[in-house]
Each structure stands twice: as C-alpha cells, then as structure tokens.
From Swiss-Prot:
The gene is truB. GO terms for molecular function: RNA binding; tRNA pseudouridine(55) synthase activity. The lineage of its organism: Archaea, Methanobacteriati, Methanobacteriota, Archaeoglobi, Archaeoglobales. This is Probable tRNA pseudouridine synthase B. PANTHER family: CENTROMERE/MICROTUBULE BINDING PROTEIN CBF5, H_ACA RIBONUCLEOPROTEIN COMPLEX SUBUNIT DKC1. The active site is at residue 69. It catalyses: uridine(55) in tRNA = pseudouridine(55) in tRNA. CDD domains: PseudoU_synth_hDyskerin, PUA_Cbf5. Disulfide bonds: none annotated. Residues 236-311 form the PUA domain.
Amino acid sequence: MKLENFYVKDDASTDESYGCYPTKRPMEEYIRKGLVCIDKPMGPSSHEVVVWVRRILNVSKTGHAGTLDPRVTGVLPIFIENATKMVKFLQESSKEYVCLMRLHGDAKREDVEKVMKLFVGRIYQRPPLKSAVKKVLRIREIYEMELLEMEGRDVLFRVVTESGTYIRKLCRDIGEVLGTGAHMQELRRTRTGKFGEDMCYTLQDLLDAYVFWKEEGEEKYLREIIKPMEVAAAELPKIVIKDSAVDAICHGANLSVRGVAYVEKNVKKDSTVAIFTLKNELVAIGRALMDAEDIYRLKKGIAADIQRVMMERGVYPKVWKSSSD
C-alpha cells in the first residue's frame, strides 16, 4: 500500500492482539480464506476442476470466477470457503485471451488487421447457440486486439475483453466482415482481472504441496500456491478503517466517515470499494457514497454502503454503540 495514493484521515494504529496479517494466518485458516489460480487443462469442465480442488484441499466449498469451456485452457481462479464471497466481484473483471482463428479463405495480413481494428470498442453480440444463457443481443466492449502471428489461413491473436464476451462468436464475426468466414480453432485465457498465467499452478502442483504439508509439516509450497483472498480485491479502490470500526461492519453496519483511517484517492461516489483493516485484512466490499475528498474532509456521514461482509464477527472487539450517525 503506497501511502501517497491515500488521504490520511486519521493516522491510527492497530492492536496486535486482534486479527491477523493475511500472510501470517495459521495454515487451516489461510486455506479457508484463500484462492488458487489453476492452469485449466483441455478436457475437463470448469466445474470438474473446481470439484477436484475441493477434494484435494478437503474443504466444503469452492467457487470459480469465469467459466471456461472444456476445450479452453488457461487461467481459472478458484476461491475457497470464506473467499467464495469474492467470486461475484472477480467475475466482472476484464479477461485476456490468446486465440487461434482459422479463416475459411485466403486473406492478406493487413486486411485482417484492418478488420480487427473495427472490432475494438463497443460491439453487439448474441450468445452462440450452444451457450446456456438467453439468446438476447448484448453490448460488450473489446479493449484491445492484436494480431500476433499469421501463417496461411491460421491467425493467432491476443484480445482483451469485457467479461461475458464470446470469443467464438467474435471469430465468426471477424470472418464475416473479412468476407472469408472464420472459426475459433483454439483458445487460451491468459488473464482474468489481475490474475495472469504467471500466478497459475497445475492441479498436480496443488496436490503435491498439500500432501507435503500434511505429511511433512512443510507449509512453504502450499502458501506459494494459495493466495490470501485479499489479493482478489487488489484492483478495487480501498478504504482502510480503524480497529474500532471493524466489528460494527461485521454486524451489518454501514461505514461511517468517523471509522475511516485512510481512503484511496481514486475512490469515487457509487464505485465498488474494498474495505480493509490496518493489518490489510479484507473486512467487506461496499459501494462508496462519497468521493474520496468528501470522506477525507467530512466529520459526519456514511462513507460506504456495505454489500458483502467478508470477515467473521468477533475478530475485533465490540467498541461501538447502536445509534444513528
């Protein structure tokens, strides 16, 4: 956390008797409040991979962000137990893919690049016939598209998209505009949100690390593979709160400006924000009701409406009273 990116409303300190820095959680708790980024192989469905992770770690609940079809490989973040509450927020993150597209006719590289540029921006898409979702026309945004290689009718390209964009349909549309026709041959997801290929591990890696911990008591490898759930909130604007405000939020209260220690300067009214303790523990996800400047300046008012509480009650002491702000 770079302090220059924050307004310091109250230079508060934290009591080491309560809570725990995420990376120092006991192993069992670390797993329950963690996530693992699996490099999904070709063949199994996303659901099957999630079930395998649940069985490997011997936990009761797992969830994934962004379904990959059985033939698609790549980045599949899987959330464990307490961390599954984060799934909804990561599902909305942008996605990056590398796709091998096959043209149905000959075309020049420069013509393919020109057509690809036409698709950067907001586009209309109707889900493919094989898709399980309702076949209604939707607007999706293509943030970037880059032709990487072209050999004959095979085109390798990288694309960064809004969540919910169908790459198979994108390939068909490119082929239609190009006049040759085209289809998706292979697809790999290389990033979802802040999770890239460099953070991914195989199912075998996870199994080996878990067995090593269980049989040898060595935690290092499992801690490398499993990340604290706080990592998933790294892209969200942050509000850091005092110890005295934590338990009130865990009991359902909204965040008062009086409970704020630091507020990131990029917090805007109505934006989704992550609320952290001074130990960098994720307390909740909320919606900002003020801009950062107002949260910093005002002495009364509600800074954020709490949408999802992540921390259990009783981790921090109750020092609040039931009263209107």
